[in-house]
Amino acid sequence: MPLVSDRKSKPLLHSNSRAIGFWMSVEGRIPIQPVRVLVSYEALSELDPTNVRDLYGALENFDRFRSQVEKAASRKFDRYGSDPEKYEGMPAIRLTTDDLTW
């Protein structure tokens, strides 16, 4: 099943995993099933290689390309489901450069 956006979800830094995380939910699931999406800094940097490759550049790219990131997350979740590793007991997926350039 695809994921749907949660526009109230603010991006949070996950410095240990060098990623930015935000929440989406499984479409049509009742009760709502949240899924944590982690996007690597490197993947976000590839969305605009002219931007500075640091944390602030990654956050800026997340804000600019959020809809593209959400589409990639939904596509990956729909195809493969969640990752084996959970986030605080909740389903999670991690996006890499390959997921965003597909």
Briefly describe each language-model feature range.
Residues 12-16, 39-41, 55:
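The feature marks short-to-medium sequence segments in extracytoplasmic or secretory-pathway proteins
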